[in-house]
Amino acid sequence: MNKKITLVLFVLLQIYALQTLASDVFKGREVFMRECMACHGEAGEGKLPGLPNFKEGQTLFKTDSALIDIVRDGKGVMPSFNGLLTDEDIRNVVAYLRSFL
């Protein structure tokens, strides 16, 4: 009986976690399309010279923390989004970027 209850709870927690992750990716896509697409392209291909192609380069092999720092603080020609995006928005954008892998 305890094994059945444990299994049911495990399955329910997994479903909840997947729904939360999907929501974060969806919200991240909305922010990306609004704030990032002009330079990085709709599919993350990098529309301007020197910008990373998220589907081919090493950028997405960085840690979430490193990517969050880049979005928050800026890097090279990329401006800082500190104060323009919430911490949650930035985490959601990183979750969306991970969907390119």
Please describe what each predicted stretch is.
Residues 1-24, 70, 97-101:
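Post-cleavage N-terminal segment of exported redox proteins
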Residues 12, 19, 58, 81-84:
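Short N-terminal micro-motifs specific to bacterial/archaeal maturation
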Residues 24, 32-38, 43, 74-77, ...:
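Short pre-active-site segment immediately N-terminal to redox-active cysteine/selenocysteine motifs
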Residues 25, 29, 41, 45-70:
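Gly/Gly-Pro-rich "capping" loops immediately C-terminal to redox-active cysteine motifs
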Residues 47-55, 70-101:
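Axial heme c-ligation environment in periplasmic c-type cytochrome domains
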